[in-house]
Regions:
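Sec-type signal peptide cleavage vicinity
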Residues: 1-188
């Protein structure tokens, strides 16, 4: 095994910015960007279809991110098996994975990455639910002291922001009908 350095990018939505929205949790801002847990999935991209070679869970204490500074970068290292083959590295954040088996085709693995939430999304509390994210990158091989940067993470949720600029009208409640209680983490 080889320790691989990773750097993820969590992009802000331009309008409105993450700083102006309500999901702030407690103590720090920009909780929509927070990465609390990471799983690394390594697929053999030299074969068709690509198959799962390795699954590594990253310890949460090894994830570095400064949300108070508005940084959208997440840094950590993970032990990966060396490989001379072309691989696709998928990063899954904030979603508990289970039951993945080596040799499973990539599409089957991605189709099994489903996040379920049966009730209201906890967005503004001590125990808020971090948004599941997915990103991937292909690399020619995994060799000693490799560093993999700029993996762009995509949030699994769509957000509806309501803006009311009038002073004589107050929105008291908003309801979303026919919403899903589960969804795919991967956009693929």
């Amino acid at each position: 095994e080889n320790s691989v350095e990773f750097s993820l990018s969590v992009f802000d939505v331009k309008m409105p910015s993450v700083a102006s929205r309500s999901m702030v949790g407690v103590g720090e801002a920009n909780k929509e960007d927070e990465v609390q847990s990471v799983d690394i999935l390594v697929f053999d991209a030299s074969v068709e279809p690509a198959v799962l070679l390795e699954w590594v869970e990253v310890e949460s204490q090894n994830i570095e991110q400064n949300l108070a500074g508005g940084s959208s970068k997440v840094d950590f290292s993970a032990p990966l098996t060396l490989s001379s083959k072309k691989v696709c590295i998928a990063v899954v954040a904030n979603c508990s994975l289970s039951g993945l088996t080596k040799g499973t085709p990539k599409n089957d693995v991605l189709n099994s990455l489903i996040f379920q939430n049966s009730g209201k999304w906890l967005a503004d509390a001590d125990n808020y639910t971090a948004i599941p994210m997915y990103g991937e990158i292909e690399v020619a091989k995994i060799e000693p002291s490799v560093s993999i940067a700029n993996i762009e993470m995509k949030r699994m949720l769509a957000r509806i922001d309501i803006q009311n600029s009038t002073s004589n009208f107050k929105i008291e409640d908003v309801y979303l009908a026919n919403f899903n209680t589960n969804g795919y983490v991967s956009p693929e």
